[in-house]
């Protein structure tokens, strides 16, 4: 497992908030947000700042939607993600080195899986459902 930074919230140049506390993240109600209205947030894991969005009803297992190789968190159709969010929490993310996430894009599927597991850990989530397509 990788460690995440425990920084205090701060506003970044883009106007999005760096979210530091996984305990708070796993108990926050994201039901007010939709795919396009949810703020893009960031969590740092081993020097990589991962961009993600969380929205939907915080009931049951959250679903983490993994991206294809160079896809970003806006590649999923909002009509689909918003429909999923009516019954559960949805988490969209950019892979390392893609979109708003920093670092280098992993060269292997194993590397992508490690990054996804590290992000899930950093968000304080014990159990999730995963959904992906292509290399996601």
Which stretches of residues belong to each language-model region?
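Alpha/beta-hydrolase fold catalytic core
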Residues: 1-63, 86-88, 125
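Detector for Asparagine
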Residues: 6, 36, 72-75, 95, ...
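Alpha-helical elements of Rossmann-like donor-binding domains used by nucleotide-donor carbohydrate transfer enzymes
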Residues: 38, 75, 79, 111-118
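Conserved HGGG/HGGXW glycine-rich cap/lid loop of the alpha/beta-hydrolase fold
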Residues: 48-102
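Active-site loop/oxyanion-hole signature of alpha/beta-hydrolase fold enzymes
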Residues: 92-131
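Active-site loop->helix "elbow" adjoining a glycine-rich segment at hydrolase catalytic centers
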Residues: 134-136
């Amino acid at each position: 497992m990788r460690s995440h930074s425990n920084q205090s919230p701060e506003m970044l140049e883009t106007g999005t908030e760096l979210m530091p506390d996984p305990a708070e993240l796993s108990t926050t109600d994201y039901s007010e947000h939709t795919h396009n209205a949810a703020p893009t947030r960031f969590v740092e894991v081993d020097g990589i700042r991962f961009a993600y969005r969380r929205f939907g009803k915080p009931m049951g297992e959250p679903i983490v939607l993994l991206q294809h190789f160079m896809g970003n968190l806006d590649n999923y159709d909002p009509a689909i993600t918003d429909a999923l969010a009516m019954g559960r929490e949805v988490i969209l993310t950019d892979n390392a080195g893609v979109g708003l996430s920093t670092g280098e894009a992993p060269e292997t599927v194993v590397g992508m899986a490690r990054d996804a597991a590290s992000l899930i850990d950093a968000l304080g989530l014990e159990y999730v459902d995963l959904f992906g397509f292509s290399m996601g």
